[in-house]
Amino acid sequence: GRSSLAPDSKEEVGFLPENPYFYKFLTGAETVSFYGRLCGLSGKSLKAKVRELLELVGLADAADRRLGGYSKGMLQRIGMAQALVQSPRLLVLDEPTAGVDPLGSRDIRNIIENLKGRGMTVFLCSHLLEQVQEVCDRVGVIFKGLLIAEGSVNELTRDSDKQEILLEHASPELMERLKEMVKEDGRAVWLEDGHPRNSLESVFLKSLLEWKEKHPNPES
């Protein structure tokens, strides 16, 4: 309802660019505090905000480490913290998981889900369509600067010409009976059957979890 040119309208917006630049000699807490002061925060309210945001993005344990020792995923998360420091109503994220390993990518998506649960509007720009499908409610497809498709994830991904049935513990005999029923129908076509596949990311995360369960103290 306000002009985007008005300076005060930008107070409602947080932004994380694809490749944010931070002062590597500052710690995580100092970085968030720096941006908080730029937004007019000070004193106890600033300290409380810094603690809250570092906890939110999972960097409370790294609050006193310099950014020069942060991984790419940690830098992206500290970037999300600075984008949230003024408690915006709209958060704009440009390729937030670009160059981030699968574990760090999952952490960032969990943060986005957390923010959605708090009622914040998150505008996400990404070429990683699998991640978009996981976290977004509505999607717009842009090609050469034009919006060529828009809708909910379910609307855009649903294939209305097909029906999908997911069975567990189905015996070979049951599968054969189902195929015979399809043949008898005369209109339906049995396209394929087999075991569902997991994404490589889910395989990686599952393997990592299993390894951690077997090695609870890897440094010992």
Residue ranges of each PLM-predicted region?
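ABC transporter nucleotide-binding domains
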Residues: 1-124, 129-143, 148-149
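Short, charged/small-residue-rich alpha-helical element at the C-terminal edge
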Residues: 153-220
